[in-house]
Amino acid sequence: MSDGNTAAAWVPTGSVTVRVPGKVNLYLAVGDRREDGYHELTTIFQAVSLLDEVTVRNADVLSLDIVGEGADKLPTDERNLAWQAAELMAEHVGRAPDVSIMIDKSIPVAGGMAGGSADAAAVLVAMNSLWELNVPRRDLRMLAAQLGSDVPFALHGGTALGTGRGEELATVLSRNTFHWVLAFADGELLTRKVFAELDRLRRAGDPPRLPGPGPVLAALAAGDADQLAPLLGNEMQAAAVSLNPGLRRTLRAGVQAGALAGIVSGSGPTCAFLCPSAAAAVDVGTEVSGVGVCRTVRVASGPVAGARVVPAPTEV
């Protein structure tokens, strides 16, 4: 713990803003339930251009404010992962978490895009910069994994192969830009309930398992959306659709509108549609919006970088 005489020397004034992306799962294979209740996952994440902005300032006490879409649905206390990230980072360096956090949400809430995990990753990066801590990237990843299995990818960004609970990451070569339409269905799907439903379905008759991720990795390396489209797969999709049958209509609407393929992303209820071009994605998004099968539609592209500090505007 630092003493009051030295603290001022290593606490610069001002603020730091970090942009951080949401994610889609292009491939998700789920192992059987382990004794500890978790499932081994093999997944391919891609960070996409729906970004939250997280600003951290020095303050007298820890506080959290949230604006933007769905902000009223989120806690602004210790229940929020961003708050927990501030406490964890401060504990790691032996300080009090005396910062104010402002989150401007563009990643839809409860959309399965790991927006809460993204905000937690952004807080780690912002505090590291604001306090000039120089905590190495390796240690940031360790802290991120303590917060949750999706937090390390929000730091990593790009495209990655995740194993374990999804937190053990290997960078994946992804040439070219892929264009997505993201349709956020009505209703929430709690991840634990989707896993439980998948366990039930497997006991009853075992929905088909995906082949290994090799062909998906090859399509990403080739940068070929037509090659990637038929390979998109999610073993949780059957469980998500079982709990929310309306997802079938959403998936059908996207493909009928011209998407190359559609998939439930992660545990849902987001449906991700791969499109052949940016213009096609706009057309598909417009058509899906008009059909009334979901609450929100967004157009995005990927891969994009993980949590990064926004450069301060230069003085003229």
Curated annotation (Swiss-Prot):
Pathway: Isoprenoid biosynthesis; isopentenyl diphosphate biosynthesis via DXP pathway; isopentenyl diphosphate from 1-deoxy-D-xylulose 5-phosphate: step 3/6
Key words of the record: ATP-binding, Isoprene biosynthesis, Kinase, Nucleotide-binding, Transferase
Signal peptide: none
Residue positions of the active site: 23, 150
Catalyzed chemical reaction(s): 4-CDP-2-C-methyl-D-erythritol + ATP = 4-CDP-2-C-methyl-D-erythritol 2-phosphate + ADP + H(+)
GO molecular function: 4-(cytidine 5'-diphospho)-2-C-methyl-D-erythritol kinase activity; ATP binding
UniProt: ATP binding residues: 108-118
Catalytic activity, EC: 2.7.1.148
Superkingdom per UniProt: Bacteria
PANTHER family: 4-DIPHOSPHOCYTIDYL-2-C-METHYL-D-ERYTHRITOL KINASE, CHLOROPLASTIC (PTHR43527:SF2)
Function per UniProt: Catalyzes the phosphorylation of the position 2 hydroxy group of 4-diphosphocytidyl-2C-methyl-D-erythritol.
Name of the protein this chain belongs to: 4-diphosphocytidyl-2-C-methyl-D-erythritol kinase
Species name: Mycobacterium avium (strain 104)
Primary gene name: ispE
